[in-house]
């Protein structure tokens, strides 16, 4: 775009003796036009063009002005104030803060055709009026560094660019601008040309290794050496990155194993890493039932099946199939992660304990669900059972992960140790007349039954529930034939001592009932021991849909109690203050930060911990207004 030349200055409202308005006519960028003194709010200058031109773009270099406006007029009509038209609306060059601090006074802005007023830009003019203003600062004079006007490009120049070299004068130096279309070296040109030349060759390079890999694979099919097969596997994939090799899981290895010759399958099985067997201690869990079934009736070491390979991703959803879990004592986000892992393994989830529930995964003892399930004889395990099953990709016996606490009883031990696979749902004991003869009939050749001790005979009772307890402990000892017999004796002795304290008054010292079990009258202990056949009580969920946040310090273990109550009544605890929080539980007095929280969320309610305790005592939702935290007068 050709630059429009300026002829002379028609008029100027204010100018400095050194930095006069004529400096705008010169090409030197260091010559400026400034006001005569500081404190003026508006100054203006009128410039005469050489001829009438259509202005296509304007370049303005600032020198301390906050706003600049450009107007155009014609000298033929007298060019009065009313004859000027706005070409460039008032544009900002400095913000108020920049004006007061004096920062960025020489900002340059280029206004193209889209920034100019179209009606004025389409006409021809020979006079330009520039108005500068600075209302924010009175400390220093202001003005312009330079102004450039450009006419529209010619059609011939747009079609065929001019080959002449333009020269820009910058102070005492002249900058020569060369045509960008000239063939010259650019930074990185040789590098990109080398890549373009070598790219066809690199595209055909993988053909060589693939052919060699196919030849090696065909020649090694007859050999049965496993090292050669591994070398083939490494040669057939030369482009595979180490990062990709690390991501190969065991499932992909199992998929590749059937494709190998049968002779290579047998030596590869023993080389798989085996998990260390758990050491047997008096507190260890019994052997899984499927291993016991293979050993029953045969000497040790015969009939044992080889270790099954770890389950792949396609079998991951069948590991805990048939298991229904209930969570207790966990907080989000770990609660949701544990639930997702259990569902990924094929288990089902229930928010509360139901008849089809099989396992209660508890974070710690003495939670409300823990006491409920313990009274119903359910199975309570630790979270490590689900985590280890997910990590090992196979179903582990849940006996190793049983919760050990003061509330455990022989009925719980019986439910946790009995069953075929060790993971079936616990069932209540059934009354059967031939219960006393079961331990003798169930004894196999691999687990010899020793004669009952006097203490066991003394512990015999006509009460059918107590006989079932003795049977459960004895059958446990039979199932654990590989364990030490001392554990079974200690367990029988402990149960016998417990039953001895509950003997009915009419029973003799030798353990025989004088009524021979013919009486229909039940004792108080029997009624107390028999679990009632009632539906599982469900906890109220009056906190459902409500979000809580614990703020500040709480004395003692009050925070843990509040978390338990809110979780038990189906409330949601937030880890941090968010828009979802509805109730803020705090033991402190009114805090100034509460007012800021109310400004962001007017529906917030600040309550005392006593509200949670009262809701637990009444087992219903009470009005929180009676327990609110209010500002002190």
Curated annotation (Swiss-Prot):
Summarizing the annotation, the consequence of altering residue 369 to A is:
Abolished binding to poly-ADP-ribose and ability to inhibit PARP1 activity
Q: Which portions of the chain have biased composition (kind: Low complexity)?
A: 221-231, 277-291, 427-443
* Region feature (Disordered): 221-313, 400-462, 471-490, 498-536
- Numbered residues of crosslink Glycyl lysine isopeptide (Lys-Gly) (interchain with G-Cter in SUMO1): 176
Query: Could you describe the post-translational modifications of this protein?
Result: Phosphorylation of Ser-371 causes dimer dissociation. Phosphorylation by CK2 promotes interaction with APTX and APLF.
Give the Basic and acidic residues compositional bias ranges.
240-257, 299-313
Per the record, residues carrying Phosphoserine are 140, 199, 204, 226, 241, 259, 266, 371, 408-410, 421, 446-447, 461, 485, 518
Keywords in alphabetical order: Chromosome, DNA damage, DNA repair, Isopeptide bond, Neurodegeneration, Nucleus, Phosphoprotein, Repeat, Ubl conjugation
Location of this chain's protein in the cell:
Nucleus; Chromosome
Q: Which InterPro entries does its entry note?
A: BRCT_dom, BRCT_dom_sf, BRCT_XRCC1_rpt1, Galactose-bd-like_sf, Xrcc1_N
Domain BRCT: start-end pairs: 315-403, 538-629
Entry GO CC? chromatin; chromosome, telomeric region; ERCC4-ERCC1 complex; nucleolus; nucleoplasm; nucleus; site of DNA damage
Q: Which disease is it linked to?
A: Spinocerebellar ataxia, autosomal recessive, 26: A form of spinocerebellar ataxia, a clinically and genetically heterogeneous group of cerebellar disorders due to degeneration of the cerebellum with variable involvement of the brainstem and spinal cord. SCAR26 is a progressive disease characterized by gait and limb ataxia, loss of independent ambulation, oculomotor apraxia, and peripheral neuropathy with distal muscle weakness and areflexia.
Q: What is the official name of this protein in its record? A: DNA repair protein XRCC1
**What organism is recorded for this protein?**
Homo sapiens
């Amino acid at each position: 775009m050709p630059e429009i030349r300026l002829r002379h200055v028609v008029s100027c409202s204010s100018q400095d003796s050194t930095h006069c308005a004529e400096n705008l006519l010169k090409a030197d960028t260091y010559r400026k036009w400034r006001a005569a003194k500081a404190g003026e709010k508006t100054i203006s200058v009128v410039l005469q063009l050489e001829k009438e031109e259509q202005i296509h773009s304007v370049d303005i270099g600032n020198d301390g002005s906050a706003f600049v406006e450009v107007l155009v007029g014609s000298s033929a009509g007298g060019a009065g104030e009313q004859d000027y038209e706005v070409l460039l609306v008032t544009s900002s060059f400095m913000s108020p803060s920049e004006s007061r601090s004096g920062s960025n006074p020489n900002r340059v802005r280029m206004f193209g055709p889209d920034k100019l007023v179209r009606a004025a830009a389409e006409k021809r003019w020979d006079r330009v009026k520039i108005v500068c203003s600075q209302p924010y600062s009175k400390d220093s004079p202001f003005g312009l560094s330079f102004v450039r006007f450009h006419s529209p490009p010619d059609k011939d120049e747009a079609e065929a660019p001019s080959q002449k070299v333009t020269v820009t004068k910058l102070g005492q130096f002249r900058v020569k601008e060369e045509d960008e279309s000239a063939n010259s070296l650019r930074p990185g040109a040789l590098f990109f040309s080398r890549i373009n030349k070598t790219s066809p060759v690199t595209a055909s390079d993988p053909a060589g290794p693939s052919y060699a890999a196919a030849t090696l694979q065909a020649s090694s099919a007859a050999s049965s050496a496993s090292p050669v097969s591994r070398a083939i596997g490494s040669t057939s994939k030369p482009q595979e990155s180490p990062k990709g090799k690390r991501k190969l899981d065991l499932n992909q290895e199992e998929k590749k194993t059937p494709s190998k010759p049968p002779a290579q399958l047998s030596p590869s099985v023993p080389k798989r890493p085996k998990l260390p067997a758990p050491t047997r201690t008096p507190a260890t869990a019994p052997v899984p039932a499927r291993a016991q079934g293979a050993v029953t009736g045969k000497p040790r070491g015969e009939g044992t099946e080889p270790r099954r390979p770890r389950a792949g991703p396609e079998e991951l959803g069948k590991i805990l199939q048939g298991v229904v879990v209930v969570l207790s004592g966990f907080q989000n986000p770990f609660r949701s992660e544990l639930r997702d892992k259990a569902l990924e393994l094929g288990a089902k989830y229930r928010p509360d304990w139901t008849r089809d529930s099989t396992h209660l995964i508890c974070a710690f003892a003495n939670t409300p669900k823990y006491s409920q399930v313990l009274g119903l004889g359910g199975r309570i395990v630790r979270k490590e059972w689900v985590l280890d099953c997910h990590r090992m990709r196979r179903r582990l016996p849940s006996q190793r992960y049983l919760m050990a606490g003061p509330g455990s009883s022989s009925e719980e031990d019986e439910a946790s140790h009995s069953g075929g696979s060790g993971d079936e749902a616990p069932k209540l004991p059934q009354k059967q007349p031939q219960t006393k003869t079961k331990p003798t009939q169930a004894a196999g050749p691999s687990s010899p039954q020793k004669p009952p001790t006097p203490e066991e005979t003394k512990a015999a009772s006509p009460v059918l529930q107590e006989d079932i307890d003795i049977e459960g402990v004895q059958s446990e000892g039979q199932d654990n034939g590989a364990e030490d017999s001392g554990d079974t004796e200690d367990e029988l002795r402990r149960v016998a001592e417990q039953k001895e304290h509950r003997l009915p008054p009419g029973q003799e010292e030798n353990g025989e009932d004088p009524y021979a079990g013919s009486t229909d009258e039940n004792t108080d202990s029997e009624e107390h021991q028999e679990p009632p056949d009632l539906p599982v009580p469900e906890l109220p969920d009056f906190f459902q849909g409500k979000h809580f946040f614990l703020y500040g310090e709480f004395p003692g273990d009050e925070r843990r109690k509040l978390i338990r109550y809110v979780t038990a009544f189906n409330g949601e605890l937030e880890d941090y203050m968010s828009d979802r929080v509805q109730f803020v539980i705090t033991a402190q007095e009114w805090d100034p930060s509460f007012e800021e929280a109310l400004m962001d969320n007017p529906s917030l309610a600040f309550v005392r911990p006593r509200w949670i305790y009262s809701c637990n005592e009444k087992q219903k939702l009470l009005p929180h207004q009676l327990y609110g935290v209010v500002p002190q007068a």
